[in-house]
Amino acid sequence: MEHYDIAIIGTGPAGLSAALTAKIRNKKILLLGSAGLSEKVEKAHTVQNYLGLPAVSGADMKQAFLQHIRQMDITITEKKVNTIYPMGDFFGIQMGMEMAQA
């Protein structure tokens, strides 16, 4: 069973931001979600309220997110989470027949 410092479920803006923050702090990350990121971001015609990216299209924002996580060498694991078990000081994460700890 693989052990991680942190498991993040979801590849929307909040999940990616959490993954970047954890990576900068040299944590071993399990980022679970779609490698295509959030469809909601890409569908946005124009995003007006994202700091540093004024009036950006959702498609351009998605590309900026993808470029940033690639530069930081963050891997997205495309597995469905079935169950999360509290295990005292860590959590067990079941993904099909696989388990991980974080």
Please place each PLM-identified region on the residue numbering.
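Core beta-strand elements of the Rossmann-like FAD/NAD(P) dinucleotide-binding domain
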Residues: 2-4, 95-102
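Gly/Ala-rich phosphate-binding loop of Rossmann-like dinucleotide-binding domains
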Residues: 19, 23
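Gly/Ser/Thr-rich beta-alpha loop segments that engage phosphate groups in nucleotides
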Residues: 12-17, 60
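Short Gly/charged-rich anion-binding patches and loops
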Residues: 17, 36, 64
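Flexible, glycine-rich phosphate/dinucleotide-binding loops
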Residues: 15, 38, 56
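Glycine-rich FAD pyrophosphate-binding loop
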Residues: 7-9, 24-43
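Beta1/beta-strand and adjacent pyrophosphate-binding region of the FAD-binding site
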Residues: 1-14
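N-terminal Rossmann-like dinucleotide/flavin-binding domain of flavoprotein oxidoreductases
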Residues: 42-99
